[in-house]
């Protein structure tokens, strides 16, 4: 894993127009003294999002799900993305794990291009009863009145980043 991370940072050093990169993932599940391994995000093993503008990259990324939350990302971009998760009073704009993953996917692409590189990068344990099994799906967050405020916070955070990056008004970005 450390050598995979080193490959990502070297790639980002050589490609200043990219904001993030990651390698290949495995998911593992211990069961009765054995461990089962499964490749993750296999359909994105050679994925790149290379649009020249934030809007082009967001359109190119549409329906891609390979979480960039766990990628290597430029420090300044991550700091700005993280700061956008909070309201001026310090409260969180959204709390849902899947919404946070979607936010980081979109936000990372606002700051630059993305690449999946051919290096082993991470192994994640699939834990029965973990947040991935108990968190409200994004499809519900987007459509349920109960989560309207949280979804609006998500949209506002992305709109602010997009407006700042493209020099648009908040209304144009929203």
Regions found by a protein language model. Give the residues of each.
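Terminal low-complexity segments of carbohydrate-biosynthetic enzymes
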Residues: 132-174
